């Protein structure tokens, strides 16, 4: 108990210092910041975007599933360079206010909300809380947000931010709709 009483405040102070250093580094970088969140699909979308955008731009992406405060902080401190043009930031949450906090930290220019589902229902307590939390990215994005209209919970979501809202999907009408998609043993096209 004594060790915990001594170590917890120290750990919090160190975290704050690391995050402050990451915030300062991010503020000094002129890169486009893209936040990606959702109950599922975050890592896949981030990885696909990183592959595509890296063909033309210098990109930094959070590795693996580094999608919480300290994972994002570590990525910014250790991997982001001033020459990076795009920062792809996966943002995960299993409690209320975590996406909002990450958005205040990263200050994304663009957001992508992949899907809303029942993951982390035990900690969020309701589907409404999950939807509200994931949509915090749409509320904090500065320029535009991409919303998956194939997801029944996102399809009619109310977004109060006056930025451009761009829909995407395969099954439902959308601004960007995947068509003629074929999948077989050799892959997809």
PLM segments and residue spans:
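ATP-dependent carboxylate-amine ligase catalytic core
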Residues: 2-30, 51-132, 136
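Short beta-strand segments
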Residues: 35-37, 90, 114, 148
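Ser/Thr-centric signal marking residues that sit
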Residues: 37, 44-45, 62, 114, ...
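Cofactor-binding loop segments of dinucleotide-utilizing enzymes, especially the Rossmann-like FAD-
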Residues: 39, 64, 170
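Acidic, Mg2+-coordinating active-site environments of NTP-dependent enzymes
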Residues: 83, 113-189
